[in-house]
A protein has these predicted regions:
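Hydrophobic membrane-insertion alpha-helices, especially the h-region
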Residues: 11-22
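Acidic, Gly/Ser/Thr-rich repeat motifs that build Ca2+-stabilized beta-propeller blades
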Residues: 22-25, 29-191, 250-253, 259-266, ...
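Beta-propeller domain segments
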Residues: 32-45, 106-108, 177, 187-384, ...
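N-terminal Sec-pathway targeting helices
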Residues: 1-13
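Hydrophobic alpha-helical segments and their boundary regions
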Residues: 8-9, 96, 392
Length: 427
């Protein structure tokens, strides 16, 4: 069945967060939340030295998680605006319940936790009185954790919600310096209206950036990092770390170099992995995928913000869409040298986790064989980079304080956290 770019965008919205019955991903019909246990393949990893445990479950459309401490996790739910605390795999309570818009990709979308001082950062589409009420904004708040509750909210960013309702992104990560917060936000599904297509979407004659279509970074208090913007001094341009993004659900930092890596969802093909250095331009709306595959691409049409922004080709693409989500670097010895410091990517299609080693410079992926051209032309070509599959709709990957891999996914009838660890005596 052929689907248009607009149809595909809408379908991915349902796939990732809504869980609509019998929706289409490429040509396959998938009943995501009407399955019986016998109809769902069990999660598996290719390495027989590793094991999978269902750590916790019962969440409603979870979109992110973060560790407060050993065996102490905060999980956010997209549609309810609820933040739950889990200790030793058991939900012990709700630490916060905020009012959110929850149509399509709006909702409670991102969480990050700083160490010193201990703050919890949340990104969500806020409404006035009830879930689904009057929309106030896409907002980044800072909270304090106190005795099982999140208190003392401080508004750090207030961003547009239109045109919407998809491509909100929302993933948060603490910077390598532990003193900054990074947020990825898409273009909010722009329409063919120049008002909504800003310079951050490579519209050189468009209006100034308004906070959409990029990676933003701020201090723990909401200020400009180092008191100087990468691309310019005007607000909110001074908060942009990267731009030219269409629709991303994943950012993560290389634990060895501090470099930021990002996943990008294509319109109907060419999902990307990008190395996002400061001032990175992902190329949207002029190009997605490799520029050589876009005959009409002209680099002169790219916005550079006076030479401060730089377009960079993707480090990898999937021709057949897989809807990449979470980005994680395996900074642990638990699984052995085979995986240590590799790049792991979660995805929607088949609930697959991909594993990529990096080259010696750690600015490129170490790809061989049919993947040496930096692209997967068929699903068969991805066998060598597949770590595990059948996890459902993966929304987050996190390393626990114990060095094990935790996978947050919409699996079967609800949200589940899986724990992947080495079998005793195998590492």
């Amino acid at each position: 069945m052929q689907i248009s770019s607009l149809q595909y965008s809408c379908l991915i919205s349902f796939i990732v967060f809504i869980g609509s019955t019998y929706i289409v991903l490429t040509s396959q019909n998938i009943n995501l939340f009407g399955q019986t246990d016998t109809e769902v393949e069990q999660p598996m990893v290719n390495d027989t030295r590793l094991q999978i445990q269902e750590y916790s479950s019962g969440f409603k459309f979870p979109t992110g998680m973060n560790f407060l401490g050993p065996d102490d996790i905060l999980v956010i739910e997209k549609n309810t605006g609820v933040v739950k605390e889990i200790k030793n795999g058991t939900v012990i309570g709700t630490v916060l319940d905020v009012n959110v818009a929850n149509v399509s990709e709006r909702g409670l979308l991102g969480i990050a936790i700083s160490d010193k001082p201990r703050y919890v950062f949340l990104f969500y589409t806020e409404t006035d009185k009830i879930d689904g009420g009057k929309i106030l904004g896409n907002r980044l708040y800072r909270y304090e954790y106190d005795n099982g509750k999140l208190v003392n909210p401080k508004l750090l960013l207030d961003l547009p919600t239109i045109p919407g309702p998809s491509h909100n992104g929302g993933v948060l990560k603490m910077g390598p310096d532990k003193k900054s917060v990074y947020l990825v936000i898409g273009n909010l599904n722009y329409v063919q209206n120049e008002t909504f297509i800003t310079k951050a979407q490579n519209n050189k004659d468009g209006p100034p950036p308004d906070g959409r279509g990029g990676v933003l970074r701020i201090t723990l208090d909401g200020g400009v990092v180092d008191n100087k913007g990468i691309l310019g001094d005007e607000s909110p341009l001074n908060k942009y770390y990267a731009y030219g993004l269409r629709n991303s659900f994943g950012i993560g930092f290389d634990s060895l170099t501090g470099n930021l890596w990002e996943t990008e969802n294509g319109r109907s093909t060419d999902d990307e992995i990008n190395l996002a250095l400061p001032g990175f331009n992902s190329g949207w709306r002029e190009v997605i995928g490799f520029s050589k595959d876009t005959p009409e691409f002209n680099p002169e049409n790219l916005e550079t913000f006076g030479g401060k922004g730089t377009y960079r080709e993707p480090e990898f693409i999937w021709r057949d869409t897989i809807a990449p989500t979470s980005v994680l670097f395996m900074h642990t010895d638990n699984f052995g040298s085979k995986y240590k410091d590799n790049l792991f990517i979660g995805s929607v299609k088949n609930g697959t986790i991909f594993n990529f080693p990096l080259d010696k410079t750690r600015t490129h992926l170490a790809l061989t064989g049919p993947l040496s051209d930096k692209k997967a032309d068929t699903n068969h070509e991805t066998a060598s980079i597949t770590f595990g599959r059948n996890f459902g709709i993966i929304t987050d990957l996190e390393l626990g304080p114990d060095g094990n891999l935790y996978v947050l996914a919409n699996y079967k009838h609800d949200g589940t956290i899986f724990k992947i660890s080495a079998k005793q005596g195998t590492n």
